[in-house]
Each structure stands twice: as structure tokens, then as C-alpha cells.
From Swiss-Prot:
Protein name: Transcription termination factor MTERF4, chloroplastic
Alphabetical list of InterPro entries matching this protein: MTERF, MTERF_sf
Compartments, as annotated in UniProt: Plastid, Chloroplast; Mitochondrion
Free-text function comment from the UniProt entry: Transcription termination factor required for processing and steady-state levels of plastid transcripts. Required for splicing of the chloroplastic Clp protease (ClpP) group IIa intron. Required for maturation of 16S rRNA and 23S rRNA in the chloroplast. Essential for embryogenesis. Required for the maintenance of the correct levels of transcripts in the mitochondria and chloroplasts.
Any one GO molecular function term: double-stranded DNA binding
A Gene Ontology biological process term: developmental process
Listed result of changing residue 420 to L: In rug2-1; variegated leaves, reduced growth and altered development of chloroplasts and mitochondria
Any GO CC annotation of this UniProt entry: chloroplast
Signal sequence segment: none
Other notes: 'BELAYA SMERT' means white death in Russian.
Biased amino acid composition, Polar residues: 507-517
Pfam families assigned: mTERF
Region (Disordered) location: 66-103, 503-541
């Protein structure tokens, strides 16, 4: 007997059942009543009754079979395995259908794509002249367009391809995340935009810095060293590398050493403002050896501290390459060893400049103009060390002035050796002093030859008042006796009945080292920052 029926399902499909009754089941009719159909469908195995049934059915394209109604465990197992198989087939079909749209690339594919993008970026950089060899391992933009944006931004800051090649790692900085925040912070501090180009050329690493973690603490530390907030931008412009130093490293040790040798604590802010490079100097390798060498030459440590307060840039002089060779050159030009301390104290720059060419030029000029004996050049330097930096034109003008005043070449030479300042004083003031000397004092020219330092004294403040007192008292004296003393000493001399020649100081240009060791007067100013100026053509008032 075969029974075929169908029933409704929620999903599309239809049910086919092939029923095979047991062998003892007598079939008399080709059709079944409704009750028989219900009994067959609702058949349950009764205890003790063994009825073997074979049911085959198909739903849509899936087939199920059961060999025995008395084996439900086997049926469930079969159904479970069939269901698992169908799930695997469904997953495979789904994977094949959606692979092209939702598949995730493998790590190998990602690395290949990354390498291809990096190759395009390198190709772009090489095309504009940048060598990307040092960029391996550095995180770079994914596309050449983003890299182009970075290069163009650096160009707007004034950096050239050569500048970028000098530090190609700058290409690893994001414009929005790194460059713009750093530059905005520097601008808010007061660093001038016109200095950004040179700033970045000297210290491009600043673009890698974090404003909060790296830059702000350094600025706060500088202010803690008594550098005024208004001076901080100038300090950064002059020495941008300071932004990369550790707070507890070289900066703190260099300041501590300077205070230890006698530099006044209140002067530290001004010193660092004028010469912030000190913050990057190692004490053991740079500062301490120079200070100790000055002591060997005869300059006490406290005097060296005062020199640093006045001229902090002397700490930047190379000891072995410049300072020691210059000291030897001075001795080669007949400067006495005992005079070296006073020479350096008066003009510290003399140990840091390119000295020999200057001395050769000065010797040649004076030998030609006033027939100077080369051996006399040493005494001239001892009296005025700044002489080595005077320009040719001002000196010739002063020599011409003296000869026009009536002095011979020999007298002019004697005056220059006795008081080299006559080669550098303000010519207008010298003319006024000479006119007063001639018309009011009516002294012979030889008095000026004997005491050429007359031109170094203020006409209104010193020369005229003292000359009037000398005339009033009817004293006849030399210019040196009248001028080469303090106001207090001069008043004492006016009370004398006779002139004591021994009181006359024969060398008014001598330098007293003790005056250098006296503490400086504290002067307040709006800003301690002063640009170092070239004093080559400076005239002494």
C-alpha cells in the first residue's frame, strides 16, 4: 500500500511520504478511511509490540528516511547528521556567494598592499629630489597625496629640499597632529614667524615634540631660572636646541657650577638670556677646563665669575683650538706673560677671535703710517687690548687728525704707544679738547706728547673745572698731575703747598684686577636680552 499526502508548511516546499506497512498487515482496499489515516499518523509504539515500519519522505529537495519506528535514537542521530551536513553545505554556498563582497584580506595581502603604497610614496619623494633611504621603518602616509601635503607645508615654512634631506625624519610628522600644534605653541610664546625657518633648520626635531609633555615643562624651567617671560621667545630663537634638553641633565649642572664659582644667583637669568648656549654645555668638558685655565694664567676664580657675568659668550670659546693658541700668539707679538691677566680681563674676546691675521694687519698698518717698531706692538696691546679689533679706516683718520694738529710722525708714534685710545676716541670730542688746550690752557704740544691720555678725560666734567682751580691757585703742574687722579685726590692736592711728583701715576692705562672682583651694581631693565654687537668700529668717548 502506498499513501501520498501533503500538508501546509510555513516555508515553501511540499511533503511526500511513502509508507510501507508490515508484512502481516492485510490490505483489502486501495483506499483508507479518515480514521485509519489518523491512526497511522498518530501511531505510537506500544510496550511489547514490535511493528517494523519504513517511512520515506522528502521535503522540497531534502530527503529523510526511517527504517524502524522502534529506533527513535537512531532516527534522531540520522536527523542530526543530516542537519549538520545541510548546515555545512549552506555555509559553503553562503561563503561562495558573499566572498567577493565581505571577505577579509589576509595578513599577507595587507602587507603586499602596504608595501605597494610605500613604494609609490618613495617614488614621489625621489621624483622631487628627496632621498628616502632613512625612512625605512618610519610610519609614513598611506598615499603619495598626503606626503605631498606634508612637503608643501614644509615648503611654506621656508624649508628647502636640502633642509629636508638633512633631516628626512621630519616627513614622519603629521601636519595636523604634530606640526600645527607645535608651531601654534611657539607663536603664542612670542617666537616670531620670521624666525621659524632658521628655527626649524637648527632643530627640526621640535616637530616631533609634544607640547604638554616636552615643550611646556622646558619653558617653565627657563622661567624658573629667572629668565623673564618676555625674554623666553628670544632665548628660544637664539638657541632652539634647548627645547630638547632634559630638565635634570646638563642644564641644571651647568647653572649649579656657575653659582659655585661665584656667579651671583641674581645674574643667572641675564646670563642665560644673553647666552643660552650655556645650558647645553657640559661642565666637565667645557666650562670647568676653561675656568681652570684662566686661573693658571693669573685670573682668580672670582674674577673669572665676574667676566662670565659681563661676557657670558666667552664660555663658548674652544679651549684647545682657540684660547690656548691665542695666548701663545700674544706672547709671540711681545706681550709680557705678566700682562696676560689684565689683557684678558679688559678684553675677553681677544682669546676667542681669529687673532693672528688681525695682529698682522695692525702691525703692517702702523709700521707704514707712523713707522712703528714691531717690538712696540706688544706694549700697545697691553695698554689697550681692543686695539687688535680696530678697523683700518678709523685709525688712519685719527693719525691724520694728530698730524694736522702739528704733531710730527715721531710724536704721533709716541702718543699712540703711550695711549692707544687716541686711535679710537670720538674725533669730535678730540677736536673740542684740543681747541681748549690750545686757546685756554695755552700749553705746548709736548705736554700732550708726554700725556696723550688728556684726550680721554671729559672736557666739561674734568678738564675745565680742574684747570680753573689750578689757574686760580696759581699752580704750575703737568697734565698728568692735574688729571690722573680721582676728584677726592685732586682736592687733597689743592691743599698742598708744594707738588709731590711721586704722587703722579705714570701709567694711567694700568688695570687693577681687584676692581673686576667687586660685585656689579644691580640694574633693573625691562629685558635682559641684548644682541651681541660688533665692537670693531666702536669709538671710546
Amino acid at each position: 500500500m502506498k499513501i501520498r499526502f501533503c500538508n501546509g508548511f510555513t516555508k515553501p516546499g511540499f511533503l511526500l511520504v511513502h509508507f510501507e506497512p508490515p508484512s502481516f498487515f492485510a490490505v483489502r482496499s486501495r483506499s483508507l478511511s479518515d480514521s485509519t489515516y489518523g491512526n497511522l499518523c498518530n501511531h505510537k509504539k506500544r510496550p511489547g509490540t514490535g511493528i517494523g515500519l519504513t517511512v520515506q519522505c522528502a521535503i522540497a529537495n531534502r530527503r529523510f528516511s526511517s527504517r524502524s519506528l522502534d529506533s527513535p535514537r537512531r532516527e534522531r542521530s540520522s536527523r542530526s547528521s543530516s542537519s549538520s551536513g545541510r548546515d555545512r553545505d549552506r555555509d559553503k554556498d553562503k561563503g561562495r556567494d558573499s566572498k567577493s563582497l565581505y571577505s577579509r584580506p589576509s595578513l599577507l595581502d595587507m602587507n603586499k598592499e602596504k608595501a605597494a603604497n610605500r613604494a609609490k610614496v618613495y617614488e614621489f619623494l625621489r621624483g622631487i629630489g628627496i632621498v628616502p633611504d632613512e625612512l625605512d621603518g618610519l610610519e609614513l602616509p598611506v598615499t603619495a597625496d598626503v606626503m605631498k601635503e606634508r612637503v608643501e607645508f614644509l615648503h611654506k615654512l621656508g624649508l628647502t629640499i636640502e633642509d629636508i634631506n638633512n633631516y628626512p625624519l621630519v616627513l614622519g610628522c603629521s601636519v595636523k597632529k604634530n606640526m600645527v600644534p607645535v608651531l601654534d605653541y611657539l607663536g603664542k610664546l612670542g617666537v616670531r614667524k620670521s624666525t621659524f625657518t632658521e628655527f626649524l633648520r637648527r632643530y627640526p626635531q621640535v616637530l616631533h615634540s609634544s607640547v604638554v609633555i616636552d615643550l611646556a615643562p622646558v619653558v617653565k624651567y627657563l622661567q624658573g631660572l629667572d629668565i623673564k617671560p618676555s625674554d623666553v621667545p628670544r632665548v628660544l630663537e637664539r638657541y632652539p636646541e634647548v627645547l630638547g634638553f632634559k630638565l635634570e641633565g646638563t642644564m641644571s649642572t651647568s647653572v649649579a657650577y656657575l653659582v659655585g664659582i661665584g656667579v651671583a644667583r641674581r645674574e643667572i637669568g641675564g646670563i642665560l638670556t644673553r647666552y643660552p648656549e650655556i645650558l647645553g654645555m657640559r661642565v666637565a668638558r667645557i666650562i670647568k677646563p676653561l675656568v681652570e685655565y684662566l686661573e693658571v694664567l693669573g685670573i682668580p676664580r672670582l674674577a673669572a665669575a665676574r667676566l662670565i657675568e659681563k661676557r657670558p659668550h666667552i664660555l663658548g670659546f674652544e679651549l684647545d683650538d682657540t684660547v690656548k693658541p691665542n695666548v701663545q700668539i700674544l706672547q709671540d707679538f711681545n706681550v709680557r706673560e705678566t700682562s696676560l691677566p689684565s689683557i684678558i680681563a679688559q678684553y675677553p674676546e681677544i682669546i676667542g677671535i681669529d687673532l693672528k691675521p688681525k695682529l698682522d694687519t695692525q702691525r703692517k698698518l702702523l709700521c707704514s703710517a707712523i713707522h712703528l717698531n714691531p717690538e712696540d706692538l706688544g706694549s700697545l696691546i697691553e695698554r689697550m687690548p681692543q686695539f687688535v679689533s680696530l678697523s683700518e679706516s678709523p685709525m688712519l683718520k685719527h693719525i691724520d687728525f694728530l698730524t694736522k694738529c702739528g704733531f710730527s710722525i715721531d710724536q704721533t708714534r709716541e702718543m699712540v704707544i703711550g695711549c692707544p685710545q687716541v686711535l679710537a676716541l670720538n674725533l669730535g670730542i678730540m677736536k673740542l679738547s684740543f681747541e681748549y688746550f690750545q686757546k685756554e690752557m695755552k700749553r705746548p704740544l709736548q705736554d700732550l706728547v708726554d700725556f696723550p691720555a688728556f684726550f680721554t678725560y671729559g672736557l666739561e666734567s674734568t678738564v675745565k673745572p680742574r684747570h680753573k682751580k689750578i689757574i686760580k691757585k696759581g699752580i704750575k703742574c703737568s697734565l698728568a698731575w692735574m688729571l690722573n687722579c680721582s676728584d677726592e685726590k685732586f682736592e687733597q692736592r689743592m691743599s698742598y703747598d708744594t707738588i709731590d711728583i711721586e704722587e703722579v701715576e705714570t701709567d694711567p692705562s694700568s688695570f687693577d684686577m681687584n676692581t673686576l672682583m667687586q660685585p656689579e651694581r644691580e640694574e633693573e631693565s625691562d629685558s635682559e636680552y641684548e644682541e651681541e654687537e660688533d665692537d670693531d668700529d666702536e669709538e671710546f668717548a
